[in-house]
Amino acid sequence: VVQRVFVDANVFVSRTLRDWICLLRAEIPAMFQLHTTEDVLAEALYTLRRNRKDADGGETVHIRQAILESIDEVLADFNGSVAYSGADPDDRHVHAAAVACQADVLLTEDQGFEESDLTPYEVYSCDDFFCLTDDAVPDRVRAVAMKQLKYWNAQPRRKGLKQALIDAGCPDFAERVEGHLRLASGVRPRH
């Protein structure tokens, strides 16, 4: 069964998280679909602009286009008045959209979402979601890790792939990626 994953803005704001979710989606199309809203995209781009005030306009256009190429659905409408018990009232629109698109998973780095028996989706951090994906299809995650390694190795004066994942809040997944890269290089896994 293909999982419907609603992606929150904070995932798109992080280049590392954005790249991984989009690359995993492209590598494993039968496993999950990505859904979001214009509101979430606007929030992500607003935050990106706030964080990088000197970025060229084309940079945000490129980021938006790259996101849209990976998204299966940009939800056009949703009922904003659905019941919501989360800690941040400004996140109501995320919950409402996740409900409207019948998401199985809400992918967010926000700790303010509460799961209950009434919530029709499960809340996952990227670290947890990426690790679950690795549990299901480790060979496909390894393929994405190899693509990512090629990109990161071509970037001068940048931190490594593992450190980027740790800095993005994915320490467990970073360890798994390091294991995939060791395996792909022929180095025996650490015990």
Residue ranges with predicted function:
Residues 1-36:
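Short, well-structured N-terminal submotif of metal-dependent ribonuclease cores
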Residues 8, 37, 109-110, 125:
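A secondary-structure boundary/capping signal
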Residues 11-12, 41, 112-113:
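Conserved nucleotide-binding/hydrolysis micro-motifs of P-loop NTPases
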Residues 12, 81-87:
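Short, flexible loop segments at the rims of nucleotide/cofactor-binding pockets, characterized by
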Residues 19-22, 49, 119-123:
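Short, glycine/charged-enriched secondary-structure capping and boundary segments
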Residues 35-79, 148-165, 169:
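PIN-domain endoribonuclease scaffold, especially VapC-family toxins
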Residues 91-124:
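Acidic, metal-binding active-site segment of PIN/NYN-like and related structure-specific nucleases
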Residues 111-191:
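Acidic, PIN/NYN-like endoribonuclease modules and their adjacent C-terminal/linker elements
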